[in-house]
Amino acid sequence: MVDTNILISALLASVSLPAHLIVLWREGRFDLLTSTDQLDELMRVTRYPKIRGRLSPTLAGRLINEVRDLAIMVTNLPSVDVCPDPNDNYLLAMASAGAADFLLTGDKRDLLGLKLFEGTKIISVRDFLVMHRRMP
């Protein structure tokens, strides 16, 4: 599964590791988990003035629709209170409910520091791509 910050980064920089990751997902190289919480966050963040000024609404809408329609929707998220940033606990709940192998994030301050949560490895996009020999 992929942290919302990775999805936003992919939208903002079409030539980047997050964008390459999204291409691999679209090619069916891995499954993507999502939840209504993540979709809500994605819609909210793409409307921030500092993001909206750098991002085409059409491009943002396309990715949101793709994630909603093609990702595996995880429901019945457990209550989780582990992350130093309480706003990220829903990502750990998604990982738990969806039995995710990986949680890919750029959050060095909070999520990457955890390294592992209930069997889910928490790593950077770069580490994931290197591990799977998918670097561009």
Regions found by a protein language model. Give the residues of each.
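Acidic, PIN/NYN-like endoribonuclease modules and their adjacent C-terminal/linker elements
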Residues: G98-D101, K108-P136
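Short, flexible helix/strand-to-coil boundary loops that buttress conserved ligand/catalytic motifs
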Residues: L11-L12, T46, K115, R133
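Short secondary-structure boundary segments
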Residues: T4, T36-D37, G106-K108
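Active-site neighborhoods of divalent-metal-dependent phosphate/nucleic-acid chemistry enzymes
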Residues: D69-L103
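Short, active-site-adjacent cap segments at secondary-structure transitions
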Residues: L7-I8, D40, D110-L112
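Short, well-structured N-terminal submotif of metal-dependent ribonuclease cores
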Residues: M1-T34
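PIN-domain endoribonuclease scaffold, especially VapC-family toxins
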Residues: L24-P78
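Hydrophobic/aromatic ligand-binding patch that stacks against planar heteroaromatic rings
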Residues: L24, M94, L114
